[in-house]
Regions:
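DNA-recognition element of transcription regulators
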Residues: 52
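Intrinsically disordered, low-complexity acidic Ser/Thr-rich regulatory segments
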Residues: 1-49, 70, 95-99, 107-113
Length: 113
């Protein structure tokens, strides 16, 4: 079935809200007051100010989701569900994400389900 949702998580790891991403192929993560230019809008989240307007992009290719940092100020990190380690995502080097991973957009946590 694969990845179907991104979850906004609080500091304790509880779900605050969710975005359905099943069936999509490309999603822009960022912040936008007008809610027009980004797919995953972090404008009104606790650490939304740490997200760039165009912070990262999720792309679906060959049955897998990948995240790429778009040259953001505060970076993109992934906490891998398998080994629990934190990985920095480099600009122009897409990184595969899997169910159970946690994506950090600055300090904003997005769970992968």
């Amino acid at each position: 079935r694969g990845i179907q949702e991104l979850l906004l998580l609080d500091e304790e790891g509880n779900e605050v809200s969710a975005w359905h991403i099943g069936g999509k192929t490309s999603l822009l993560i960022g912040r936008d007051e007008h809610k027009e230019n980004v797919d995953i809008n972090l404008q009104n989240t606790e650490y939304g100010g740490m997200a760039d307007r165009q912070h990262a992009v999720l792309n679906y290719a060959a049955g897998q989701w990948y995240i790429e940092d778009l040259g953001s100020r505060n970076g993109v990190r992934i906490q891998n569900a398998k080994d629990g380690k934190m990985y920095q995502v480099s600009k122009e080097h897409p990184c595969r994400i899997n169910t159970g991973d946690i994506i950090f957009i600055g300090n904003t946590r997005l769970g992968v389900r």
